[in-house]
Amino acid sequence: MNEKYEAVIGLEIHVQMDTKTKMFCGCKVEFGAEPNTNVCPVCLGMPGALPIVNKRAVEYAIRASLALNCEVHEESVFARKHYFYPDLPKGYQISQYEKPLATNGWVELNLPNGEKKKVRIRRLHIEEDAGKNIHEGDKTLVDLNRAGTPLMEIVTEPDIRTPEEARLFLEKLRNIMRYAGVSKADMEKGQLRCDINVSIRPKGSKEFGTRVEIKNVNSFRFVQKALEYEIERQINVVEEGGEVVQETRTFDPQTGKTYPMRTKEEAEDYRYFPDPDLVPLKVKKEWIEEIKKNMPELPDQRFERLIKEYGLSEYEAGILVNHKEVGDFFEEAVRHFKEPKGIVNWLINDLLGLLRDKGISIEESPVKPEHLAELVKLIKEKVISTKIGKEVIKEMVETGKTPSQIVEEKGLKQITDENQIKELVKKIFEKHPKEVERLKQGEEKLIGFFVGQVMRETRGKANPQVVNKVIRELVKEV
């Protein structure tokens, strides 16, 4: 990026709440159902059908607001946002405008240079989702299963300055939503969607440049790529003496470029007004306090606790926290065998890589937490060596068998019997008299040679420490 300029970035994120039913009716929320099967007169916008607020969705929105350090208002108002689109059967969307549920929050980011940065949250409000248009050839099909699904719209202040910060913010937000238990926040399933507002200005300037919106970018990587391209594009326009046009653009992952869509609507275009079918949403202070009291552990709290409770490094704790299910797997394994350092090493350095190679998520892992704990125990108690452990964990991923089963079936138990190892070392000494002589003369590196010979003979099953000790003792006797 040109050093003369800085980017000013704000994000609008739609998060689908993980409720069983829709925002204003009793229809099921279900990903991948047959088109137009989860619909009723309310979400189809039939005349005379009246909305009823989903209490669980309001609870989730309050929980999310608290997790984002927002101030939750005791009164908020549902408003109609009017626009015409085939997937919006009522001709308006029920949202919140002048009086949102929550305002004035913040999220703290850990930047790669070690600094911390606060991104302020302007507002969080509740709304319903639209349906989905599916384009097939020259036809457009409309699926209204998604219409009426509960959403939260989270709007940041324009505090973000780089494409990387935008990606880090979204990753952190997804994590907070998952930890708070309000959304799976899976971008691939459309449970988290992001619109980007970006402008540029000369470094040090307090004025805002002309804002461009990039719509519906559907992965964190693409958010970063779209911003990198768009910032560069705006700088080039200004450098060549032109003016950035206020517009809505779309990002094409194939080309890595943004393209114009339509002129950006102003809020007036939506003709917001309070929804006459819904009374203002009043939330009692006691209910907010009760939700606050029962808040689950959030990512930053877990990060601190993992370091304190288990003695993990920041790097290890970071990996476990950034993938909630991986953190849950680790803690479950430690419950079965209290060896956190060993478990985290095998989890991060071995198991996750093996699962990634097979395209399996930790939730679908054939290796259960108690089995990873058992493997670490077998190594700790010197039943098998670390080297054999590597083979065993591969087999565990392939077959789903327990480590004990594999060790038993394949006869992989470590040989720790000194007499058995002594006999072996004597035979190897007989085969390599010259090397024995050199070792006696003090050529220490030959210890490694003899350990290697024993390991080869036992197919890696001899305990290397015992082998080392026996070699040192026997060489004195020769």
From Swiss-Prot:
Keywords: ATP-binding, Ligase, Nucleotide-binding, Protein biosynthesis. InterPro entries: Asn/Gln-tRNA_amidoTrfase_suB/E (IPR017959), Asn/Gln-tRNA_Trfase_suB/E_cat (IPR006075), Asn/Gln_amidotransferase (IPR018027), Asn/Gln_tRNA_amidoTrase-B-like (IPR003789), GatB (IPR004413), GatB_C_1 (IPR042114), GatB_Yqey_C_2 (IPR023168), Gln-tRNA_amidoTrfase_suB_CS (IPR017958). Pfam families: GatB_N, GatB_Yqey. GO terms for biological process: glutaminyl-tRNAGln biosynthesis via transamidation; translation. The keyword Glycosyltransferase does not apply. The keyword Protein biosynthesis applies. GO terms for molecular function: asparaginyl-tRNA synthase (glutamine-hydrolyzing) activity; ATP binding; glutaminyl-tRNA synthase (glutamine-hydrolyzing) activity. It comes from the Bacteria. Its EC number is 6.3.5.-. It catalyses: L-glutamyl-tRNA(Gln) + L-glutamine + ATP + H2O = L-glutaminyl-tRNA(Gln) + L-glutamate + ADP + phosphate + H(+); L-aspartyl-tRNA(Asn) + L-glutamine + ATP + H2O = L-asparaginyl-tRNA(Asn) + L-glutamate + ADP + phosphate + 2 H(+). Allows the formation of correctly charged Asn-tRNA(Asn) or Gln-tRNA(Gln) through the transamidation of misacylated Asp-tRNA(Asn) or Glu-tRNA(Gln) in organisms which lack either or both of asparaginyl-tRNA or glutaminyl-tRNA synthetases. The reaction takes place in the presence of glutamine and ATP through an activated phospho-Asp-tRNA(Asn) or phospho-Glu-tRNA(Gln). HAMAP family: GatB. PANTHER family: GLUTAMYL-TRNA GLN AMIDOTRANSFERASE SUBUNIT B MITOCHONDRIAL AND PROKARYOTIC PET112-RELATED, GLUTAMYL-TRNA(GLN) AMIDOTRANSFERASE SUBUNIT B, MITOCHONDRIAL. Belongs to the GatB/GatE family. GatB subfamily. Heterotrimer of A, B and C subunits. This is Aspartyl/glutamyl-tRNA(Asn/Gln) amidotransferase subunit B. The lineage of its organism: Bacteria, Pseudomonadati, Aquificota, Aquificia, Aquificales.
